[in-house]
Amino acid sequence: MKDTKLQMLTTRFEELKMSEDELFDSFYGKLNEVVIGKFNLGEKTEDSKVVRKILRSLPESFHAKVITIEKTKDLDEIKIQELIGSLQTYELSLPS
């Protein structure tokens, strides 16, 4: 049962994407739910994996910001909260 739940959460983690009309906080809430679920079943997801997942899962409207982050930050060292703050600030600058 535990293995089945873990496999379902792993699949959800891999497939989760942010849609163009979704707010970043909503997307991150869903992603964080999956990460916490996996942790509760005994599997820790490395921060660098979560950072890369977030950057891969953002819609086209975030493309310029993703490129900037990838070029200027060490993705193995950036803190998830730092990334979240940066993306939330960027989202506020997007036309609504």
Map each language-model feature to its residues:
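Intrinsically disordered, low-complexity linkers and tails enriched in Lys/Ser/Pro/Gly that lie
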Residues: M1-S96
